[in-house]
């Protein structure tokens, strides 16, 4: 190696080390690079210090704005936890991406066990959305209005809202959110819609459903909970993003993490870095992909080990806040160049001006290999080393080459 080449490589290494993720994201044309946070994490001073750096320009409350914590009894609201995170976003001058208004999980018992009619549940749905969105009006850049409404085959989940209202609950929810805060971006958010298939087609159908009802939907959130070595290819992710943006909506990567089977190895870390780079590059190189959010940035607070037995180390920082190779994979993706990642929708973008996959927002869980994977759990796919049978009465069904699930 020549001396000149050695110097150039050293300079390049120094440049990468000094760059930071949100700065690089904005330079690439994205609005932000951010992370989900949960209220218990905020007592950790080192955690907070890292949030104040130029690595992050957006915050999502992981749990604090969901139905159970915000309206635990009907008509009685509590915003203490959500306000704490909104205040943090304001003090850091970050975008606040609010999460979420309507989900089948983390619902209070008065919703799940209520004696509802179509009319009374519609009224409760509208009242909840109006109460929460009005409280945070002007603070949220975007809302995940409806979260995870689909089964893996693209049909609607049989949740309490669908059972009493039908698919109409989705455009009703979007209309209520739009009325409460006309300037907030409104998203549908889900997992396993990052590649072409029945579920992605179902999500595109939700976009069309809202549009056909005369409503406004501004974007689709691609959660992107991936597995090391099984992340969809760059071409696959870009084509899938383009299928959504062709409908006139933005996309955002909303809950990114890439888990591995433990114990961690250098080879797994290298592959994880490549997988993070692939996903980041897909967003940067897709017009209409507006930003990327990690589902927490450090392994110390990751939801993965508590949900997927034997798996973890899914984040770009380790439990001691050291940057892993994944961090530099993200940075390389952000510096990969693009056409343009600007928004495809026409509503006004806002940042937080005054004070959001769920430590686990996905419903997939696993159990030990001896007992089989639980309902909705992963049971196969390229590189999968976990259980390949399901607990009764569920069966393992192949959804795509990367993912089989107990259904």
Curated annotation (Swiss-Prot):
Per the UniProt entry, the signal peptide is: 1-19
How does its activity hinge on pH? Optimum pH is 4.2-5.2 for birchwood xylan and 4.0 for CM cellulose.
Active site positions: 148 (proton donor), 255 (nucleophile)
Task: Give the InterPro entries listed for this entry.
Answer: CBD_sf (IPR035971), Cellulose-bd_dom_fun (IPR000254), GH10 (IPR044846), GH10_AS (IPR031158), GH10_dom (IPR001000), Glycoside_hydrolase_SF (IPR017853)
Q: Which residues are glycosylated?
A: 118
Gene name of the encoded protein? xynD
Species of the source: Talaromyces funiculosus (Fruitlet core rot fungus)
- Please state what the protein is called: Endo-1,4-beta-xylanase D
Q: Please provide the record's keywords in A-Z order.
A: Carbohydrate metabolism, Disulfide bond, Glycoprotein, Glycosidase, Hydrolase, Polysaccharide degradation, Secreted, Signal, Xylan degradation
The subcellular location is: Secreted
């Amino acid at each position: 190696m020549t001396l000149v080449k050695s110097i150039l490589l050293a300079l390049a290494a120094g440049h990468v080390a000094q760059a930071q993720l949100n700065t690089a994201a904005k330079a690439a044309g994205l609005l932000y690079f951010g992370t989900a946070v949960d209220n218990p994490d905020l007592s950790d001073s080192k955690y907070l210090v890292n949030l104040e750096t130029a690595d992050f320009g957006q915050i999502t409350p992981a749990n604090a704005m969901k139905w159970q914590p915000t309206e635990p009894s009907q008509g009685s609201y509590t915003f203490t936890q959500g306000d704490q995170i909104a205040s943090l976003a304001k003090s850091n001058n970050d975008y606040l991406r609010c999460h979420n208004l309507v989900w089948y999980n983390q619902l209070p018992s008065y919703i799940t066990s209520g004696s509802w009619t179509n009319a009374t549940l519609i009224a409760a749905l509208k009242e909840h959305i109006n109460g929460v969105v009005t409280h945070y009006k002007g603070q949220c850049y975007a809302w995940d209005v409806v979260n995870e409404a689909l089964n893996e085959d693209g049909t609607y989940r049989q949740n309490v809202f669908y059972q009493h209202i039908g698919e109409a609950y989705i455009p009703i929810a979007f209309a209520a959110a739009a009325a409460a805060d006309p300037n907030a971006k409104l998203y549908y958010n889900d997992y396993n819609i990052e590649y072409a298939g029945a579920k992605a087609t179902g999500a595109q159908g939700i976009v069309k459903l809202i549009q056909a009802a005369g409503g406004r939907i501004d974007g689709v959130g691609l959660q992107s909970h991936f597995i090391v070595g099984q992340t969809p290819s760059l071409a696959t992710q870009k084509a899938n993003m383009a299928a959504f943006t062709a409908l006139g909506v933005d996309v955002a990567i909303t809950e990114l993490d890439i888990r591995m089977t433990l114990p961690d190895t250098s080879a797994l870390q290298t592959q994880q870095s490549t997988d993070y780079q692939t996903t980041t590059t897909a967003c940067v190189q897709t017009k209409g992909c507006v930003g990327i959010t990690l589902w927490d940035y450090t392994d110390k607070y990751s939801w993965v080990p508590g949900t997927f037995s034997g798996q973890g180390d899914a984040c770009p920082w380790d439990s001691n806040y050291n940057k892993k190779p994944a961090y530099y994979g993200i940075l390389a993706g952000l510096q990969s160049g693009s056409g343009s990642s600007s928004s495809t929708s026409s509503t006004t973008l806002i940042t937080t001006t005054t004070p959001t996959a769920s430590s686990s927002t996905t419903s997939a869980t696993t159990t030990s290999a001896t007992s089989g994977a639980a309902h909705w759990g992963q049971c196969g796919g390229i590189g999968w080393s976990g259980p390949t049978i399901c607990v009764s009465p569920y069966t393992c069904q192949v959804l795509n080459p990367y993912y089989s699930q107990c259904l």
